[in-house]
């Protein structure tokens, strides 16, 4: 929803405690295979080779004429593995454009928009709230991400700034999203509406 309780109350949660946002509607894509880096450097506005493994990069998805299609957050796992996050309103168009543009037969493009839940945490207590639920030794710093397994399921945790510069974003299998959301609220997160 765009709002749970009171807009001011939700805003204050992100400034003085921890707000939690369901951002599952954002586009989520995975590109893997030899030549993935080179292919993305032809489709995105930044030099992907400047992004290190385990880091994120804000970039733009371009049309074949060089026009801006969407803002993309790129997570580089390796030169052959990338996770891409696009805006909700452009998710289908982004995937179609990527699919049309992939020229290497060894590359695999997957649309994970409906398969993955996305939850954002924002506020000074975000790290503390997440640490109560996910007992990681270290949480990613700004511009970083990490993968982890929980209950046999692969998850991704980013600090890519999808909601704000300081937000944490959790990507987990859709079937586990409600459980994560409820556990994070029990740990102190206050639900907030999203207009992404």
Residue ranges and their predicted role:
Residues 1-62, 67-69, 195:
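Acidic, proline/glycine-enriched N-terminal capping motif
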Residues 12-19, 23-24, 68-80, 109-112, ...:
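Residues forming anionic-ligand binding surfaces in small-molecule and nucleic-acid pockets
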Residues 34, 88-89, 124, 175:
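Short, surface-exposed acidic/glycine-rich loop or hinge patches that mediate macromolecular interfaces
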Residues 46-104:
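Well-ordered mid-protein domain cores that form the structural environment of catalytic cofactors
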Residues 32, 36, 94, 122:
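Hydrophobic (often cysteine-bearing) scaffold residues that line and stabilize catalytic clefts
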Residues 27, 80-83, 117, 168:
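Short active-site oxyanion
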Residues 30, 85-87, 171-173:
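Short hydrophobic/aromatic beta-strand micro-patches
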Residues 102, 106-196:
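Glycine-rich, acidic
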């Amino acid at each position: 929803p765009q709002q749970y309780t009171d807009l001011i109350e939700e805003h204050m949660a992100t400034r003085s405690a921890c707000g939690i946002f369901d951002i599952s509607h954002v586009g989520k894509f995975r590109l893997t295979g030899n030549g993935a880096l080179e292919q993305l450097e032809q489709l995105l506005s930044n030099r992907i080779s400047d992004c290190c493994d385990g880091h994120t990069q804000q970039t733009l998805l371009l049309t074949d004429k060089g026009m801006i299609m969407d803002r993309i957050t790129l997570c580089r796992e390796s030169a052959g593995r990338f996770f891409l996050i696009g805006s909700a309103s452009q998710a289908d168009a982004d995937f179609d454009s990527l699919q049309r543009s992939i020229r290497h037969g060894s590359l695999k493009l997957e649309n994970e928009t409906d398969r993955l839940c996305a939850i954002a945490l924002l506020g000074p207590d975000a790290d503390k709230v997440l640490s109560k639920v996910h007992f990681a030794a270290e949480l990613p710093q700004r511009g970083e991400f990490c993968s982890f397994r929980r209950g046999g399921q692969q998850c991704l945790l980013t600090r890519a700034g999808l909601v704000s510069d300081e937000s944490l974003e959790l990507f987990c299998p859709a079937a586990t999203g409600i459980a994560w959301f409820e556990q994070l609220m029990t740990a102190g997160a206050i639900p907030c509406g999203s207009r992404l």
